[in-house]
Amino acid sequence: MEHDGTAALGWAARDASGHLSPFSFTRRVQEEDDVTIKVLYCGICHTDLHTIKNEWGNAMYPVVPGHEIVGVVAGVGAGVTRFKAGDTVGVGYFVDSCRACDSCGKGDENYCPTMVITSNGTDYGGATTQGGFSDVMVVRQDYVLRVPASLPPDGAAPLLCAGVTVYSPMVEYGLNAPGKHLGVVGLGGLGHLGVKFGKAFGMKVTVISSSPAKREEALERLGADAFLSSRDGEGMAAAAATMDGIIDTVSAGHPLVPLLSLLKPKGQMVVVGAPAAPLQLPAIAIIDGGKRVAGSGGGSVAECQAMLDFAGEHGIAADVEVVAMGDVNAALGRLERNDVRYRFVIDVAGTLHAAAAPS
């Protein structure tokens, strides 16, 4: 590596329009425990959309988004022992943590209060982090993940965020027991992976959606055992107290009480979708039946590696539409309209430099 860092090319947003265009910048110098990664594919997450449009008020322009990254190791520092050149690896939502707080001590780096996120974060040297809509990453080896050879690299990319977001709470809260009944609310990028993991765990899986048109998709394409329209009052009543657990992946505002009615006594609902408006939760809805509601955000390094290994063993990959970097703005527009089944993934290595070339 050059003494002054590694030249990088990405696509960045410069303002709240969210429009992306080519952006040249410099990655930090590869240190002793760093892995330099040639980016192959990067998924597009709703978080990227929120960030580049400054919908959360924290954008530090220019912003290179992307935190669902699969690539190949191009170089390693002298102290790196876990990876070598040519390995297929992944990088998820964060690239560093303090390693000193209570959460880090417990292996829950994803809850570290000073966690360094992969894009639009601030590293411990004060620099703004730039994400995977770029040709190269430099990441500490402790935050790099090994991607099983059995997984397609494009379909593996969304597992680094969407995959671990559903896998982690399923394992943490015991919603992975064979023979148990799992409800998956929503059939988007998160929900379709919840179905796949649930079936691989040996569970009975029911998809719950406000869109009856998704019935065939849930049952025929994804292999869910049942489909329940949340708009079907009779169907919801018939399914009351039948589910051991529910993963709620919906990011639009929606009532929780009808979903809680589906749980058996002492059932567990885990919320991983994040609606902008507060969710309404009357106390009696959880007191009656001793039901529990929890939240979950992403997953730790160990959980993410376990998820990738499990996915590799069971052939679980995201259903993706691969797009060229030159089409990324159109893809972001479609994502905003929920016009994707189920995740967009950018072919970074194959299209980034061509898209940036003068026409």
UniProtKB/Swiss-Prot annotation:
Residues where Zn(2+) 1 binds: 45, 67-68, 161
According to its UniProt record, the EC number is: 1.1.1.195
Which co-factor is required? Zn(2+)
Tell me if Transmembrane is a UniProt keyword of this record. no
Q: Name one GO biological process term.
A: lignin biosynthetic process
Cofactor binding, note field:
Binds 2 Zn(2+) ions per subunit.
Q: Which reaction does it catalyse?
A: (E)-cinnamyl alcohol + NADP(+) = (E)-cinnamaldehyde + NADPH + H(+); (E)-coniferol + NADP(+) = (E)-coniferaldehyde + NADPH + H(+); (E)-sinapyl alcohol + NADP(+) = (E)-sinapaldehyde + NADPH + H(+); (E)-4-coumaroyl alcohol + NADP(+) = (E)-4-coumaraldehyde + NADPH + H(+)
Residue positions annotated to bind NADP(+) are: 47, 165, 186-191, 209-214, 249, 273, 296-298
What highest taxon heads this organism's lineage? Eukaryota
Q: Which CDD domains match?
A: CAD1
- A GO MF label: zinc ion binding
Q: What class of enzyme is it?
A: oxidoreductase
Pathways per UniProt: Aromatic compound metabolism; phenylpropanoid biosynthesis
Which Pfam families does the entry mention?
A: ADH_N (PF08240), ADH_zinc_N (PF00107)
Q: Which residues bind Zn(2+) 2?
A: 98, 101, 104, 112
According to the record's subunit comment, the protein's assembly and interactions are: Homodimer.
Family, as annotated? Belongs to the zinc-containing alcohol dehydrogenase family.
Quote the function comment for this protein. Answer: Involved in lignin biosynthesis. Catalyzes the final step specific for the production of lignin monomers. Catalyzes the NADPH-dependent reduction of coniferaldehyde, 5-hydroxyconiferaldehyde, sinapaldehyde, 4-coumaraldehyde and caffeyl aldehyde to their respective alcohols.
| Protein name, per record | Probable cinnamyl alcohol dehydrogenase 8A
Source organism (scientific name): Oryza sativa subsp. japonica (Rice)
